[in-house]
Amino acid sequence: MIIAGTVIGAGMLANPTATSGVWFAGSLVVLLYTWFSMLSSGLMILEVNTHYPHGASFDTMVKDLLGPAWNVINGVAVAFVLYLLTYAYIFVGGDLTAKGIGSAVGGEISLTVGQLVFFGILAFCVWASARLVDRFTSILIGGMVLTFIWATGGLIADAKMPVLFDTQAPTGTSYWIYVATALPVCLASFGFHGNVSSLLKYFKGDAPKVAKSLWAGTLIALVIYVLWQIAIQGNLPRSEFAPVIAAEGQVSVLIETLSKFAQTGNMDKVLTLFSYMAIATSFLGVTLGLFDYIADIFKWNDSISGRTKTAALTFLPPLISCLLFPTGFVTAIGYVGLAATIWTGIIPAMLLYRSRHKFGVGKNYKVYGGFWLMVWVFLFGIINIAAQILSQMELVPVFKG
């Protein structure tokens, strides 16, 4: 459940908007392509990890197999992504916590208090143990499934096939010209790679069990993403997405626009609850990966003293940044996907290639495929980097409804 919780973040709510250019059939292809590539790269990391002691993370593997230069590049990319995501989750989760507490007590609660409450409870879980994170995440995932079904069950049943499978692009154009803007968002929807080493440690080196959890967690996410696409793109016509795109996929605007074509009821409140649980599970998964990554770098053990030092370096920088600069890093967040592609696409393929030459296949696990899979994942990384750069420079078509 740690993998499913990490992958299924509140960002998935924006997937129908990000893929509105390629629409439903195109989004299925992009989601399947991204799911397979990201799962494969995660399994590559797992195989490489079997050659190292339990607890060894990216720092140990990249330094040993690719050298100090690549280790610096990878380390900066990993730290940038995980710290920035932690910052973002504290900010958004704290805001929702403050509003929830304020509504419950009938008063106004400051953002700072909300952030400290949200952070304190979840950070304690990560400091305590991966087992507690797993159990808490399982509860939250159950709540997410219930709220998701509650919010979208009727919409999925009422989905209209002519709307869902709309393929009438304007004359002389194609839906596929918008694929570059869809790829980076879908990649961000399948990020779990920082947790592979944590899971191998949690399962005491049982790599096949870790592989099963990666398959199960990412498949759960894929199914939920496809159902969400059906719920939205099966009811809201492609030609009516302009206000949603202008609002950058904001959930309230999406629901308001959708309500003109379908019964939405209390969907906004239910999706807010879903978002809150999704943010909490993502926070737990991301920070657990960051926690073990930092412990590996400094070789701090699992004693109370060691875990406390690791927790301090894991949580204090993003917490202090969030309290001092509650609206900062907005521009930097746009580059999270670019940095993540380095260590979720390019680095895993390089690691497996060097690992196979140095050690042979994994000790008790071998990822499917061979050299062709390494090339596939490496090219997946290159394609996503190109797509993100071209999209941010506005050198590719952008669908605006």
Give residue spans per PLM region:
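TM-loop-TM module centered on a large, flexible mid-protein loop between adjacent transmembrane helices
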Residues: 56-68, 221-279, 300
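Transmembrane alpha-helical segments of multi-pass small-molecule transport proteins
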Residues: 1-7, 76, 100-129, 144-151, ...
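Hydrophobic alpha-helical segments of multi-pass membrane transport proteins
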Residues: 145-154, 277-289, 313-317, 336-362
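Hydrophobic transmembrane alpha-helices that form the core helical bundles
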Residues: 40-106, 272-296
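Extracellular loop-to-transmembrane helix junctions
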Residues: 16-47, 59, 220, 399-401
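Helix-loop-helix junctions that connect adjacent transmembrane segments
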Residues: 108-117, 129-131, 135-249, 253-256, ...
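A generic transmembrane alpha-helix motif of multi-pass inner-membrane proteins
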Residues: 327-401
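Loop-to-transmembrane helix boundary motifs in multi-pass membrane proteins
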Residues: 108-117, 206, 216-224, 233, ...
